[in-house]
């Protein structure tokens, strides 16, 4: 079974926020790696794409069996994508955060 995966506006805004954070951090460092923000977003999008085939393998988030979290490793840490399995064919990514952030919003 294949699922259609969509990112909500909030999730897209989270990707923009994470990109901007990494870019600003790298610009302030000696020996900056300006490809890092692009690599991070590519890793996130690649991880999110796995939800097309296996959303039920991700850990549950809260009481609903349809609200789940995808862990996307990157560097020494990674990211967490909160998503909802809406029905038998649709998955919505609701939010994305760095693993070291306390919460989604």
Region locations from a protein language model:
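Basic, Lys/Arg-enriched alpha-helical interface segments
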Residues: 1-68
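Enriched for short, Lys/Arg-rich terminal
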Residues: 30-31, 72-105
